[in-house]
């Protein structure tokens, strides 16, 4: 048995956390969630677990007959894309700053604060590939905005194919054979945030009379068979599609940027499944486990069915992994989505300096200013310990090291 069993007054919690730290607050948050009467069998916890807003990051929450919107959160469909290119390290320019600049030009990133200013994190004139992807989203958007007109006043179309802020990134990496990979991390951007925020608030309003009886107001839920349950599922599915297409559009534009710098073909003539991956790690969907149909919410966790490929990034400056799932049913066929934080962003900014950031990322062409100190490698768990703790969940196919990193 590779997991620690945490018993509660209702469902148990199975934690793949051997050799990695778990905060007391995160444990309590997990216990609170496990108290909900509709938890199916047990909650599974990944080794990158840490306290989260609304729900514990690194948790897999199986439910029957209900869904907790705050467990999915506001970054609906957040996840990873990775592509193994036809390039090798020798094909990259000597001056990697040139490549980083080309990627930053190709993909809007960051955010401009203040009214009446053009947001640098959104398109002014979206390119053709963004238009094509928006066409796949348009029918769902029409339903969403007709039923909930509030979503008309959101960043939607002009956020498609953009990176965002925080821990979202685009990286150029090398594997063990010095093959070049593109790896990126983003979600459903402004529209996903608006959908998540609205339905979290709505669940709490709908449960206003009984909200105080819950272990936490963040555990407010929609019951299956209600109108809001159906609407939430439909809205979330749309936001998850937005997130997936958002990453695809960015990948296409990074490929073009890389091609313009190297003057070489970037995509391989034939790409294997393990060499081009697009996976969510913040989402909910219906799945079958232990012979029953249930809803599985993965909050900072990746699906790892037998033979399924996934991406586990380390912190900025650390190793990342392309993995293949082992289909461990006890984890609801899941694995971690990264290294997991050992301290808050606020604490990291107080504890570390720009000089620390420069030293920690000396081998990576990336931003090294005060605004990204919260992403310093020391703010995260040891990725090797995280991988060791989930050796029965996934096997490593490729180990990657970053050489270029773009942050919002």
UniProtKB/Swiss-Prot annotation:
Checking InterPro entries in the record gives: RtcB, RtcB-like, RtcB-like_sf
On the tree of life, the source organism's domain of life is Bacteria
Name the catalytic site residues: 337 (gmp-histidine intermediate)
Disulfide bond entries: none
Its induction note reads: Expression is repressed by RtcR.
Q: Which GO terms describe its biological process?
A: DNA damage response; DNA repair; RNA processing; RNA repair
Q: Which residues bind Mn(2+) 2?
A: 78, 185, 281
Free-text remark on how the cofactor is bound: Binds 2 manganese ions per subunit.
Q: Which SUPFAM superfamilies does this entry report, sorted A to Z?
A: Hypothetical protein PH1602
Enzyme's top EC category: ligase
The annotated consequence of residue 75 to A reads:
Almost no guanylation activity. Can ligate pre-guanylated nucleotide substrates
- Where is Mn(2+) 1 bound in this sequence? 75, 78, 168
The chain's coiled-coil residues are none
- Provide the binding site for GMP: 167-171, 281-282, 313-316, 320, 337-340, 407
Additional remarks: Ligation proceeds through 3 nucleotidyl transfer steps, with 2',3'-cyclic phosphate termini being hydrolyzed to 3'-P termini in a step that precedes 3'-P activation with GMP. In the first nucleotidyl transfer step, RtcB reacts with GTP to form a covalent RtcB-histidine-GMP intermediate with release of PPi; in the second step, the GMP moiety is transferred to the RNA 3'-P; in the third step, the 5'-OH from the opposite RNA strand attacks the activated 3'-P to form a 3',5'-phosphodiester bond and release GMP.
Assembly with partners or alone = Monomer.
Query: What is the name of the protein in this document?
Result: RNA-splicing ligase RtcB
Record organism: Escherichia coli (strain K12)
